[in-house]
Amino acid sequence: MCGIVGYIGNKDAFPILIKGLRRLEYRGYDSAGVALVNSDTALNVYKSKGKVDNLVEYCSDKNVSGTVGIAHTRWATHGEPSALNAHPHYSESGNLAIIHNGIIENYSDIKKKLMANGVKFRSETDTEVLVQLIEYIKEHKNLDLLTAVQVALHEVIGAYAIALLDKRTPHQIIVARNQSPLVVGIGDDEFFIGSDASPIVEYTDKVVYLEDGNIAVLHKGEELKVVNILNRRLNPEIQTVDINLGQLDKGGYPHFMLKEIFEQPDCLTNCMRGRVNVDTDNVVLSAIIDYKKQLINAKRFIIVACGTSWHAGQIGKQMIENFCRIPVEVEYASEFRYRNPVITSDDVVIAISQSGETADTLAAVKLAKDNGAFIYGICNAIGSSIPRATNTGSYIHVGPEIGVASTKAFTGQVTVLTMLALALAKEKGTISSSDYLEIVKELHEIPEKMKKVLELNDRISELSRIFTYAHNFLYLGRGYSYPVALEGALKLKEISYIHAEGYPAAEMKHGPIALIDSDMPVVVIATHNAMYEKVLSNIQEVKARKGKVIAIVTEGDDNISRIADEVIELPTTIECLEPLLATIPLQLLAYHIAVCKGKNVDQPRNLAKSVTVE
């Protein structure tokens, strides 16, 4: 993995490919490369370690002419980060070039077979094995390129999204997908390729999201041809994407992450638009209207997710159980799919993923669906794989999230889970009218209260400078605030590279308290709710051991203000909605500490935005 771009048409391909790679930088990568076929049918492949800027500099004195090309940003999976292991990879003859996202699981067996037949390899990657296999089949069986690709992919086990060039047929690109996203943009006598739509939308809003097992032939001057591995012609749906190009730029902010933190009030307004009606004091989700029977009669909900989405799921669990009186389990998708879980037709599985392409979550959806469960998706990326695989669901509608560390997607996911719990509870009759109306009205007020929290940015920026020395942080919360503590710790780890752990506050005495000393900052979410007094006792225990307390409190709190080292006050809200406000100071704290330490906030080391391989 991580990013695929391609172009075939009448324009110079190189600038389109480079701009496309820049659009995909948010996904994370360690090297980049490009392959172009020029008018003399020469195949030129250029690769470099590091950023796209390095590739552009390397190509500054190279022949980058041509109207057909493919390009790639790579996160190392097989073979170390290097120019040699970067994509594109080319065949032994130099006729074919390929880019690939995914993992070929049986690459070692295929490589041994090819080496036994005299094929020589340059790199350590599974991707080179694939291009060598395609050429070997093409030449030894005297097949055309499409048929050779179909035969080769029949031998392959694993996930892939590929784009393939042959300099002998310079007017076509062949692409294929299995368990890794791939989008084809359709322009005026031209085609575009992307891992997602972001490299494409500047040129066309007409796209085809390839399905697993699809192989597409992009031939200049012809219609898009899509077939399966058995060469049966398919008729994919051409969709219209609506992405504002301004959402793909920083908009005057120094980093995408800060921009996206500040976008959250507007994002939540968009998320609730047409769903939360304050005039009628009602929450309406089309999924519950269309699939009321399946959702109301469910005996159990299972939430599957990874990372930040898993934390949102933990908040959703508490709301669904509290309001709907349905038992809820929250599972890491990577564990769920491999532990032979008990799944029945009475279960509703909620799959949460910002990208809609998270490999483990997608596999968990397939497992649950195969076992008869009803699947509800909560995603951000419209047209992505998980929404297409589910029975129904809700988009969070927060716009493209470019920063690798999720911010607005988290609050969008929590908002959708809140609306789902409220709407379902009302249908089931498990929530009182007064509680329902109070929460609906307060939910509508959350975006304005978020704006007040964001006014604390300068204060949190100053506070962050005090704690850049720390090598460890502890985050504590109880009830709805415990997942917020987990999320705050994750944000700090992701972008500042400071070790941090989130714990239920009461569990501090069962181990973590041994770590607390004068060098240990402890972030405590201590808003004024039912467990306030107990959390106050935890803070006193931290202070007794000389720990430095950063307390997130409800405005007007005098008790904690007297004992905590630093206090951040939040507007008053209902307990179940506190995560939507309390998470923002933790996002800002992580951001400003990372900036103070000189870290790459938008592209932290070793992390990819969309984890499309296991």
Model-inferred region functions:
Residues 264-268, 272-302, 392-521, 594-614:
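Active-site phosphate/pyrophosphate-binding segments
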Residues 296-438, 442-445, 525-566, 589, ...:
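Glycine-rich phosphate-binding loops that contact phosphosugars or nucleotide phosphates
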Residues 67, 71-84, 279-292, 316-352, ...:
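Glycine-rich oxoanion-binding loops at beta->alpha junctions
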Residues 548, 561-563, 573-614:
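Generic C-terminus detector
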Residues 156-190, 463, 468-494, 531, ...:
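Acidic/histidine-rich
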Residues 68, 96, 300-302, 348, ...:
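Structural motif
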